[in-house]
Design a protein with these regions (language model features):
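Bacterial N-terminal signal peptides
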Residues: 8-18
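N-terminal, motif-rich segments that launch catalysis or mediate targeting to/interaction with membranes
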Residues: 22-168, 175-339
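Bacterial N-terminal signal peptides that target proteins for export
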Residues: 1-8
């Protein structure tokens, strides 16, 4: 057995134990949403669709650009999953205005759980590395689910909350959205922001580790392209991914996760363990080689290659996480929407 598979097996054992009580890109998020859509009964689809028609961006985004061969119900529901990324500010050239970007909640997409390089454990022992009062994806998911459950919540707010639930359940299953890597160097003493400051090469391409994982399921290099042709292409790519994963047989360990891990915290803990055991590990089990990368700007030329074994393992891990996200999100939606 290779060193990498030994680490994956160790992670599987860890994450199946009882837990103390930019995420996938558009392709990945919409693939999760499509898997969810196919698991919902007609009654829940109708209830979701009715709610979404109260959304402030229903005509402008959720229903916009629909291809002729896709029903409005399916198109709108699947696109809920990427709306929270669509409202992100796009810099000085963003002409959409505050009517769109006012809904942006940057801290809601992730939680920075510290992963300390084992060789530096003594350096960080006893230190508070992440402000415990910062809001994060766990808080956001609880709040949005409660908003949908509460009868007095206005339909417009429920529609917005539904979009966040679709998106954040996808995010919480992306390992790099649940971690921050620390080591005793000037570049990582405050963490790497979930791989956003960690540069590598994958297949010869320089990329931040976070972005590499976000893009594992498909390419959406021009996320700001709102044209109907581009959005239809992304939708088709997502359907291909969903179709390829629909018949994926989960291993017994993953089936046990579905049965045992039913809380947002337990889903995040699964992702954190995978980040430690797969996301930041080389094929020999050592911490992944990488170089400090600027949050904005080019990846340094010195970025090392992750290797074919890492690429294959990362892809396989992402596929399982997408399937788990789809099944869990479908069940959670049934719970919060009611009969």
């Amino acid at each position: 057995m290779s060193h990498r598979w030994k680490f994956i097996l160790a992670c599987t054992l860890l994450t199946t134990l009882p837990q103390a009580a930019y995420a996938w890109n558009s392709v990945g998020h919409m693939a999760v949403a499509k898997l969810v859509y196919d698991r919902l009964d007609d009654g829940h689809k109708k209830k979701l669709f009715t709610l979404l028609q109260s959304h402030p961006h229903y005509e402008r985004y959720l229903a916009a650009g629909r291809p002729d061969n896709v029903s409005e119900v399916e198109w709108a529901i699947v696109r809920t999953s990427v709306w929270p990324d669509w409202v992100r500010p796009r810099g000085d050239k963003d002409s959409r205005g505050a009517e769109v970007t006012r809904y942006h909640r940057p801290e809601d997409h992730y939680v920075n759980v510290p992963f300390i390089d084992p060789k530096d454990a003594a350096v960080f022992a006893g230190k508070t590395l992440i402000d415990p009062d910062l809001t994060n994806i766990l808080d956001a998911l609880k709040q949005r689910c409660n908003e949908v459950r509460t009868k007095t919540t206005a339909d417009i707010d429920k529609a917005i909350a539904v979009c966040w639930i679709f998106h954040l359940v996808g995010d919480i299953h992306q390992p790099l959205h649940n971690v921050a890597y620390f080591n005793d160097t000037k570049d990582y003493r405050r963490g790497d922001l979930g791989g956003n400051l960690f540069g590598v090469r994958a297949g010869g391409q320089r990329v931040k580790l976070r972005a590499y994982w976000d893009n594992l399921l498909g390419d959406d290099s021009n996320y700001a392209d709102d044209s109907a042709n581009h959005q239809a292409r992304i939708f088709r790519e997502a359907l291909k991914v969903a179709d390829s994963l629909r018949g994926l047989q989960l291993a017994d360990a993953e089936q046990k996760k579905l049965a045992d891990n039913t809380t947002f915290k337990s889903w995040s803990q699964e992702s954190f363990e995978l980040a430690k055991c797969v996301g930041y590990r080389q094929s020999d089990g050592k911490i992944l080689a990488g170089v400090p990368a600027p949050f904005k700007g080019p990846i340094p030329e010195a970025a090392p290659e992750v290797g074919d074994d890492y690429i294959k393992t990362a892809r396989a891990t992402a596929e399982v996480r997408i399937v788990l996200a789809g099944q869990r999100l479908a069940e959670r939606l049934k719970l919060v929407l009611g009969k």
